[in-house]
Amino acid sequence: MSHTTITNFLAGVIARPQGGNITSDETFRRYRTIVRTSATIGGNEDSRTTSIFHEIGRAVNTKGKALAVAGMEAPLVEASYPTNAVLVEDFIGLAKKYTNFSATFEYSSLAGVVERLARGLAACSVFEDVTSTDLRGNNPLAVHALATYDGPVNSLTSAVFIPRLVNNALTGDVFAVLCNCVAGEGGTVVTDTIELDANTRQPIVPEVGPLGVPGAIVDALRLLGSNMIASDQGPLFALALTRGIHRVLSVVGHTDEGGIVRDLLRCGGFGLPFGGIHYGLEEYSGLPALQFNSAAATAAYVDGIALVTAAVVAHADPGERYNGEWFPTFFDGTTHADTMRRSGDSTEGTAAMADRNRAQLLARQQLFWRPYITALGACFSTAGDISVAERFQCAASHSLGADPRHLRLPSVAPYFWIEPTGLIPHDFLGSVAEEEGFASYCWRDTTRTRPAWDSIVLSGARDTTFSAYHIRMKGARTAWFLAHWLGHPENGLGATRVRQLDPNAVLHPGPCEGNEQVRDRVEADLPLTDYLWRRGQSPFPAAGELLNLTSEWGILFRHVTFTDDGDLNPEHLPAAHEMADTTVTMTVGRPIGIAPGRSNAGDNQARRARTRASVELSAASRRARVFGRPDVGEMPTLTSAPAPIPASPAYDGNRGGEAGGVTGRGNNRSAAPGHASWSERQADGVPVNVTPHHNALRAPPFPRQQGALGGGGNVPLPPAPGAAPPPPPGPPNGPPAGPPPSDDGSSNPAAPVPTAIHAPPAAAQADRAEGQ
């Protein structure tokens, strides 16, 4: 199965690389990402610049440990996959040419070779004397040539066929590094032709020096990438490469528990490699070529992969559902034997808590590995089937040791390794974590604008001095208002006051000296900054920072303060008429190398304990795992009043009447279906025919008459004394007078009107006269 590479996502991750080999455990390669945010205050743009720091150290202190082979009791996991049918036919052709070669290539397993190549590349960025021989980790090199070997060659178990044509004018050292990596994984190399020593009959494989090894490894990785992509195993290739990088390097996490993913990637190993490597496939370009062989260039190349694969963890967080809302994945390591504390209190972690968190993590790990491996495939531009990679990593993760230090906490939100802003686009996967605002804010060299709050509604009246709002903020990370004002030199957050908050619904608040419990902070009318963590390498809140299960906040903003003399002092906040419509614009650069040095990572002092909120959120996770849905009929314990019930119109039966009636408010005010006063009456029964009729206010139209009408209306007035009589109804020689004009303004002539109502015709009057 072939896939077209659309973009090279890993190209140019780091700008201006500095630093090379890491000489001590206290030395870290450091990078700085510049972030600019802006908002409108008083009609003027307010801008500030901050930085995100990333640090990368070494996980081992010698190259021998970095490239050590798996022991006899190492937990290895088989990760074989079906080989592409076209490649199978090509490899089987060798069995027809060489009778001593019994080939079966229906399945292949090259992920272990990819992981060792990645470990060698990472070791080249840490140590300065890595050669191709070091890649096999003191294992013997076994190479069989089909043309010169006089015994049978079996490829069913642990043999990898590597043709000599993997070398060309540009990639002349690929064969050497591939042979040593296969040997380091315990496999045997089979090739078409090779030079043997005349005296010892040992194969002669060239040795590549420290300057040539990094480039040769990258070329070999691109070759294996094209082979595994051809068999629809691009995600497995990306996972194996990621595991190899993080087994040698150590990316410093931005949260206490975020490094647990690094520990999981170091668990287990791949089984013995077997299969064949084809040299004639389309070149894989998802992994950039290494342009320079300097130590700084190699370090920047490897660190770019390490940072991207660590940052995308936040985008793959499967999350929890609580009361219809999405929250980051959360594990509670306490039990009923632990004391229930208030939000804001802190409890020291224990080994028992670490083991309980570990059990929960492994029980739900598949929900994380599925999107994470998909994300790795997108990073390396290697789409394909993720089932083999997912099954392998789920099995390998069970070798995670007991009492992991990253889980030795009362509660953890594990899937936030480092700040992804500047490394990953905000919509990279289309995951729920991205939609809810817990992933990256913005990608490198781009600009993005968002509302300052997810939802904000004015509470009461406002003026130019104070304004209060009901704000929706399920976590500190979802509020872009904090992305701009948190750590701002003008300290605008000091003019905020948290007035309404349910302390029992708050998770992972920050420290506050003198008011440790969240309840006391609300009563003390403290600003929003006293609820947040201490800032370290990232200026932005973490995904698990200051979670609120109700998502509701009542915050008072002081726009102006006055001195004792009446002088006003404008606060660094949007004006009262601007607050509800405030937006924040963010522009992010790419990581820039700075001088290596000691780590500046500090303790964020997050307050963790067994609280009502931690029990509720962790219970939702367990209910979802057991029953398939997180909802439960039990009402959570909160100290805030429920939402007000909307008022409904009064029932007609409660209106009027005499005094003394009982009209309880607890009764239902709406009539039952079918009642005459039911507001939604429905038609029913057999339809009736249409019948013309006259209602009580209408009558058949009668023609109007001339002269007086009955009832005293329209009586002609008598002529004045000495005046001439009135003229006849019509002119002497003209037609009789017509009816009055139509009331509706119509110009159509009306029908003739008789002179009197029920007047007999002229012929009938003549007959009557003759009869008399």
UniProtKB/Swiss-Prot annotation:
Keywords, in A-Z order: Capsid protein, T=2 icosahedral capsid protein, Virion
Annotated Pfam families: Totivirus_coat
Bias kind Gly residues: ranges: 654-664
Domain of life per record: Viruses
Spans annotated as Disordered: 593-772
InterPro entries, alphabetized: Totivirus_coat
UniProt biased composition (Low complexity): 743-766
Gene Ontology CC: T=2 icosahedral viral capsid
Skewed-composition ranges (Pro residues): 716-742
Places the protein is found: Virion
Family: Belongs to the totivirus major capsid protein family.
General function of this protein: Capsid protein self-assembles to form an icosahedral capsid with a T=2 symmetry, 40 nm in diameter, and consisting of 60 capsid proteins asymmetric dimers. The capsid encapsulates the genomic dsRNA and the polymerase and remains intact following cell entry to protect the dsRNA from degradation and to prevent unfavorable antiviral responses in the host cell during all the replication cycle of the virus. Nascent transcripts are transcribed within the structural confines of the virion and are extruded into the cytoplasm.
Protein name: Major capsid protein
Organism name: Helminthosporium victoriae virus-190S
Lineage start: Viruses, Riboviria, Orthornavirae, Duplornaviricota, Chrymotiviricetes
